[in-house]
């Protein structure tokens, strides 16, 4: 299982249920990596999408504790155990965790690859991703050249869980 996330220099990922910044090439990378795949998210992440609707051309799996929550064209699960059971139906190489904060934290132990867009700026944030740089289980295995979008410098990084 993989995850995909954009973080600032403090590993911030969001503020008031929105991304910290919108970078077109990051959005394009997200689309290219997740199109036709299974994506895992929490309810608040789904509700942050335009119209609160699932992303097209992907299997959208949403974790929520609300037993009455229903959204067309989504698979709704209510526990991590139920999610893991549901995910057995899909190729683990084609599953991406896409947020938010609590879903990332709960699913990180099941992930072996993390695609991280690292933004060289500290934004105001109220949601964070675990700092993989300080986690001895993870290492950077690929990185892009630094990119610039207006005054924003960023880089695409691939982290992999170290083999035991």
Q: Where do the protein language model's features map onto the residues?
A:
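Enzymes that bind and transform nitrogen-containing heteroaromatic metabolites
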Residues: 1-164
């Amino acid at each position: 299982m993989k995850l995909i996330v954009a973080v600032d220099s403090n590993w911030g990922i969001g503020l008031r249920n929105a991304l910290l910044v919108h970078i077109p090439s990051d959005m394009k990378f997200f689309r290219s990596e997740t199109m036709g795949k299974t994506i895992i998210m929490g309810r608040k992440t789904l509700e942050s999408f335009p119209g609160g609707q699932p992303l097209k051309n992907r299997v959208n799996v949403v974790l929520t504790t609300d037993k009455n929550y229903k959204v067309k064209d989504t698979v709704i699960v209510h526990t991590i155990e139920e999610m893991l059971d549901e995910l057995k139906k899909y190729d683990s190489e084609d599953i991406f965790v896409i947020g938010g904060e609590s879903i990332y934290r709960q699913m990180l132990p099941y992930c072996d690859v993390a695609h991280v867009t690292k933004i060289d700026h500290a934004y105001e944030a109220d949601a964070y991703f675990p700092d993989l740089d300080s986690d001895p289980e993870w290492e950077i295995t690929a990185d892009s050249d630094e990119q610039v979008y207006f005054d924003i410098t960023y880089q695409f990084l691939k982290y992999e869980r170290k083999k035991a």
